[in-house]
Amino acid sequence: MLTHARRADSQGNAANVPDEGSIRFRVPVDEVSLTFHAADAHGLPVNDLKRNELNLLDNGKPPRRVLDFHVQLDFPIRAGILMDTSESTEKNLSGDRAIAGKIAQRLLRQPTDQAFVLAFGYISTVTQTWTGDQAAVAAGVRNAIAGRENPLGGTAIFDAVFRACHSEFGAVDHAAGGNFIVLFSDGEDNASHGDIRLAVDTCQHANTAIYVFRAEPVLNSSSGPKNLMELASETGGRVFHDNDSEAGIEEDLRIIEAERRNQYVLVYKPAELRHDGSFHRIELSGPDRAERIAVRSGYYAPAH
């Protein structure tokens, strides 16, 4: 991963704001680069946290040493728009397209902002490759057609998320932008080859959060809501339900942009890091004024 070569001092001062000319370096494998967003009770960014206001635990232990701490404002947007076109969500597809179109208009505003569109059912299809062109993204959203990705029936959500994080986000710089997926689905998966853990793990590797616009499940006993909550919470994202409210949708998009554009970067050496590929659980908390801290649930140690 990449991070700015700007070191916080030992007195716990507020995070530095790197300028455009900051030097970048590649983080060694025995260091962890953690990005997170802090917001107050009103959902507004808290961009003045000090290092000594944070409590970080890596597998239950504080880090051996913090090497860098700064706030990165105006991160470039890297968005993957994933549209569920299976039969169970067909009634929601037109509304989902409208929201996805707003994402293109609202979030792709800077020359460095980019997005792709992936439609999925039993199989998945990239209907628009990476681009910063709002019109091209909107066209890719319109090309998410109900049933086209379902020649055999069924829905493979986990496989679609895996593909997005492995093949799309896996090919871009994980630390140079605010990476996230916007997933439109009811969460019902009955056709994936991989499981939800593989999807989550792959997104954690790619430093990619998942934001969900949830459709109501067809069955009351559906596992869909649980699946969507796990995908979002484990990657530092959210689940939204305000699909029918124009004001609610606007607020949801404001939250997504605030969380992805304004990020803290914390680079540290864990107390214990063996090169065994094991999962490290991250717990991060801050002062009361930072009511929500959006951070992924953990990371994987190097395998060798």
What are these regions (language model features)?
Residues 2-304:
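Scaffold/interface architecture of coatomer-like assemblies
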